[in-house]
Amino acid sequence: MALRKIRTYEDEILRKKSKVVEKFDQRLCQLLDDMKDTMYEANGIGLAAPQVGVLKRAVVIDIGEGAIELVNPEIEQVEGSAVDVEGCLSVPNVWGEVERPQKVVVKAQDRFGNEFRLEAEGLLARAVCHEIDHLDGILFVDKVIRFVSEEEIEQRRSRGDKMDLE
């Protein structure tokens, strides 16, 4: 396993649409493992393949309940909405309030190509939507309602608020 370089907002790859994964092989497994290692090393809660320079529809997420791998994810259902603060490993030291669905149902495949559905709500739903946006060349700053200062982030952290600060 290896750490991969996280691309930042200046990199054009982050604005491109990712391709569907068609080969479920050792290279995909290696990519997913490397993405998890990279995400954990960077103290993130999610990482999409384009963020490590790979235009494939694959994401990893861990909001503290164990890693989830989503290959070729598609949002099938959304319910409700909520505004909360997000950040992104590809847009360092920038945070903002973003409106996202409160609940989502996602159809995806695992690393072996097996299809499954994931029902997510709250922070997990937010992280899933944020990462799927990356697969379509969308950054959270494109959806920010209000940018948030570092001081406000520190206040929220000191209260123990869970935020998608990737």
Curated annotation (Swiss-Prot):
Its EC number is 3.5.1.88. It catalyses: N-terminal N-formyl-L-methionyl-[peptide] + H2O = N-terminal L-methionyl-[peptide] + formate. CDD domains: Pep_deformylase. It holds the Pfam family Pep_deformylase. Coiled coil: none annotated. The keyword Hydrolase applies. It is an enzyme of class 3 (hydrolase). GO terms for molecular function: metal ion binding; peptide deformylase activity. Removes the formyl group from the N-terminal Met of newly synthesized proteins. Requires at least a dipeptide for an efficient rate of reaction. N-terminal L-methionine is a prerequisite for activity but the enzyme has broad specificity at other positions. Belongs to the polypeptide deformylase family. PANTHER family: PEPTIDE DEFORMYLASE. This is Peptide deformylase. It comes from Caldicellulosiruptor bescii (strain ATCC BAA-1888 / DSM 6725 / KCTC 15123 / Z-1320) (Anaerocellum thermophilum).
